[in-house]
Amino acid sequence: MAADKPADQGAEKHEGPGPSSGITDQEKELSTSAFQAFTAGNYDVCLQHLTCLQDINKDDYKIILNTAVAEFFKSNQTTTDSLRQTLNQLKNQVHSAVEEMDGLDDVENSMLYYNQAVILYHLRQYTEAISVGEKLYQFIEPFEEKFAQAVCFLLVDLYILTYQAEKALHLLAVLEKMISQGNNNKNGKNETGNNTNKDGSNHKAESGALIEAAKSKIHQYKVRAYIQMKSLKACKREIKSVMNTAGNSAPSLFLKSNFEYLRGNYRKAVKLLNSSNIAEHPGFMKTGECLRCMFWNNLGCIHFAMSKHNLGIFYFKKALQENDNVCAQLSAGSTDPGKKFSGRPMCTLLTNKRYELLYNCGIQLLHIGRPLAAFECLIEAVQVYHANPRLWLRLAECCIAANKGTSEQETKGLPSKKGIVQSIVGQGYHRKIVLASQSIQNTVYNDGQSSAIPVASMEFAAICLRNALLLLPEDQQDPKQENGSKNSNQLGGNAESGESSDACSSKSHDGDKCIPAPPSSPLRKQELENLKCSILACSAYVALALGDNLMALNHADKLLQQPKLSGSLKFLGHLYAAEALISLDRISDAITHLNPENVTDVSLGISSNEQDQGSDKGENEAMESSGKRAPQCYPSSVSSARTVMLFNLGSAYCLRSEYDKARKCLHQAASMIHPKEVPPEAILLAVYLELQNGNTQLALQIIKRNQLLPAVKTLSEMRKKPVFQPVHPIQPIQMPAFTVQRK
């Protein structure tokens, strides 16, 4: 949760013209008067002085800059388009491309660059804003103290928004040193100054208040940085400083709630959120932040972590409603459609969090088991965050879940004959049983429309997975971290909903480069490897469903070649490869993949971040057991996975007319699980074997009882090739996990 408001750039970014060499006393007087009027909020008077200055010195672009700034503040900061246009014109006029900043002239132009960086920040063009801010930081020594602090605070905010916590902490250390030195210098000057006692005391009180506010802001930024880095011990120390300096304000309580959320103390996190006084917040028109929206979103994130997904989606919908209400109020103030950034305070350009909230809603709905509703949310979010490979995977999982059978059918079998007997025809001696077809090959999932049209079809799932693979970097073949498969658990990962469990950490290796994945937090090397495994598993499943066996085999082989592959996905890789090979009539190769000894582990893997997080807790502080649990997936154990392998191996032996081996596999598998857990495909396989053996009555008994019966030892020769009934391909077992992004 990053509820603390960003650096109030609007209050410090524009300073009036200061005296410079080569100007007359009249210009100096007008300049000082203009600045004093601007500081007092008398913008009309300020503009009058600036007009007089413009008449005297028409070539000074700084007067035009200050005029534009004064007019911007006169409009209550609602003419962003006009200010932006003026700044661009001035930039071209002084031929000051950012790349050319290398001298004292650029120090003189620093105010122009800073204002551009602030506008880029509010337009969410963070990379460009960082580029300008870092150039300014190179020349920070000659700057006035207040302006230097403003540059640093802007850069800190940008670094945190882009998950560069280490850089943010470095700048915060510089800021602390700067404020400490400035305070000492001021104390020394006050001792020898000739100001009156009254003016001196007022100035000192005002200066002290500003210093305390800056220190409080620094502590809040440190908490946000440590939260991103999952350094909970350091975060705990800073939280105490925040509570001491900011008290029980909404930003401090939101930050502490986020801290408790990361520790697993979910009830305490909810309690802290509920204790925050939202009514005291200045409002989104002044800060650009809708605190009610953040409140509901954070509650949704906490309940998601507690596996209370229905409550979570309830809170996310409340957050969406608040966000839509705020956006409706803001759009009502815009009158000129050609100026989309005007007619509203500049800070409100950052207010709309619709797409981050849609991301959260989509992930939550996917967990609830409503893939079509989740698809509608995520397909809207992907239009903004189209460079996020994890988001494309989530869309594909929506399509898969919307087009597959129920999980009970796949994992628990059927207690009745519903999945085996399609109908009964005839009467008496002519009575016949029509068995249900279990084949899913070459299924047509769309109705003739283009697969590029975003509908929850398997064809569109294939496109989503292709996009996800293309967005992954190619150099992922040098593993450094422990084996594990963690689908990045994220509900939006930027500053809108929660800090994700895979944010860039100070504990990461130097070789681990973070790949941006907004609105989630960045993907590190280990997360990229795990994500690639999940994408390949889904790709193989989708290709099998579409009947593209060669592509399915290709994806399955690539999956099995991954250096960091969890036991669960390795099991699926062998299963999908075997099914593709059987469809390609390469039975011997398929039998190799179906060897039960290939399955030695079905774990999902453990996130190194969760291990780090646990190590930061005190000895007597236990994490609540209600959240952050590993999903219960199929297969749940090595024995159940080997059972699936044996059932499929029996089918493969049938295709080679090796019925003794098939029967042995079938009954070996049946002995390993409860009779009610036998899948309908295995019962059909037993029926087929008995029919081939000539035991029609026994086959009927198997159908009637819907369970396997003891084997009959005599076998008859098979006269026709069996029809292979493959076990329904299992969807990649890990539910879409994601990182709760909290503000």
Curated annotation (Swiss-Prot):
Domain of life per record: Eukaryota
Bias (Low complexity) ranges: 183-198
Biased composition (Polar residues): 484-506, 602-612
Sequence ranges of Basic and acidic residues compositional bias: 1-16
InterPro entries in UniProt: CNOT10, TPR-like_helical_dom_sf, TPR_rpt
Residue ranges of the region described as Disordered: 1-26, 183-204, 477-520, 602-634
Assembly description: Component of the CCR4-NOT complex at least composed of CNOT1, CNOT2, CNOT3, CNOT8, CNOT9, CNOT10 and TNKS1BP1.
Name of protein: CCR4-NOT transcription complex subunit 10
Organism the protein comes from: Bos taurus
Taxonomic lineage from the root: Eukaryota, Metazoa, Chordata, Craniata, Vertebrata
